């Protein structure tokens, strides 16, 4: 990625890649694959590393995420709470209508800022 301060190597377990991209002081975690009880610890570790380093805005991009279960939702809620304590914010980019419905039905969209695409702002 041109102009990126740091493109972290993909951290991977079977079924999930999490790539951390830092650019112009912002942090983006690109999540590719399925987030479930097996893969959620990877997301938790990478996300909390960023939360501890950056009390600003952390963006989690779920564009290439095909599934997220309650374990994955819990990881996002926990990270959002941690960032809130530090006066930061977690934003989740989730263009998939199916995944947005999961966020809405679970009530997680009331706890985590979810947008449909990166241009939706907030």
What spans do the regions from the language model cover?
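STAS-like cytosolic regulatory interaction modules
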Residues: 1-66, 78-122
């Amino acid at each position: 990625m041109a102009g990126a301060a740091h493109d972290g190597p993909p951290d991977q377990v079977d079924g999930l890649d999490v790539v951390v991209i830092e650019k112009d002081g912002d942090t983006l975690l690109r999540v590719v694959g399925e987030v479930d009880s097996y893969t959620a610890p990877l997301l938790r570790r990478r996300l909390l590393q960023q939360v501890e380093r950056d009390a600003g805005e952390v963006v989690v991009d779920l564009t290439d995420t095909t599934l997220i279960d309650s374990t994955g939702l819990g990881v996002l809620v926990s990270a959002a709470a941690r960032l809130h304590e530090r006066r930061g914010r977690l934003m989740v980019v989730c263009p998939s209508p199916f995944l947005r419905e999961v966020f809405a039905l679970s009530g997680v969209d009331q706890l985590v800022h979810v947008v449909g695409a990166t241009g939706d702002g907030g």
